[in-house]
């Protein structure tokens, strides 16, 4: 186990307010997404929602107009292939993760109020395997 980042699932069924709540609570700075959601994220930023988001990584080819629109709201937009290329060329050693690091925050739908987040550690995940 050598990755020390945390993943947080954001589902298309979540409304803008739920996404705003999750991004602020977790201080989420980067979202990996599909082309179809880029405009929605830009609109959220224009509405002063998801203010912690600074980077978008698109699994799909990026349109120049989307890059400009993202820049206008303070987001850097790149393609997933660019991230892979940068990682391939980076020789910085990984920081080995610890058993109590959190690889996943899992959020509920929040049927009563805001979404509830569950922090899962590496130990939690391995005990379920």
Model-derived features: where do they sit?
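Conserved pre-ATP/AMP-binding loop-to-beta segment of ANL
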Residues: 58, 76-78, 85-107, 114
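Generic signal for short, ordered secondary-structure residues
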Residues: 1-2, 20, 87-88, 111
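Flexible, active-site-adjacent loop/turn segments at secondary-structure boundaries
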Residues: 12, 92, 116-118
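Structural core segment of the AMP-binding/adenylate-forming
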Residues: 2-82, 97
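Well-ordered alpha-helical segments embedded in enzymatic catalytic cores
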Residues: 18-21, 124, 128
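Acidic active-site catalytic centers that drive phospho-/nucleotidyl reactions
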Residues: 25, 101, 128
